[in-house]
């Protein structure tokens, strides 16, 4: 699902809320999440999951086209860990 599809789904399930308000709410939520991660904070949404940063050490990688070795610098990457309730909903058919 894309951000546009999310906004459309929310608009169809909430016909009394103006589309512009829904767009702004989604954008504001995503901006708040991004800012929190940018500041090194952990975000926890109970029942859904948590977002945090994981540190990746520098390493030597390879260019997939040429096979040439490439130095990859150390960096932080966003990480999502699904919560118990989300895991259960996703695995309802297993």
From Swiss-Prot:
GO cellular component: chromosome; cytosol
Molecular function, one GO term: structural constituent of chromatin
Gene from which the chain derives: ihfB
Keyword Transcription regulation (UniProt): yes
Disulfide linkage: none
Keyword terms: DNA recombination, DNA-binding, Transcription, Transcription regulation, Translation regulation
Protein name: Integration host factor subunit beta
Complexes and interactors: Heterodimer of an alpha and a beta chain.
């Amino acid at each position: 699902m894309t951000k546009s599809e999310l906004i459309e789904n929310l608009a169809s399930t909430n016909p009394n809320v103006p589309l512009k308000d829904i767009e702004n709410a989604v954008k504001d939520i995503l901006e708040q999440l991004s800012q929190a991660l940018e500041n090194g904070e952990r975000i926890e949404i109970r029942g859904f999951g948590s977002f945090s940063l994981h540190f990746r050490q520098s390493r030597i990688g390879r260019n997939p086209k040429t096979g040439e070795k490439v130095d990859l610098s150390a960096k932080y990457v966003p990480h999502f860990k699904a919560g118990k309730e989300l895991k259960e909903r996703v695995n309802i058919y297993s």
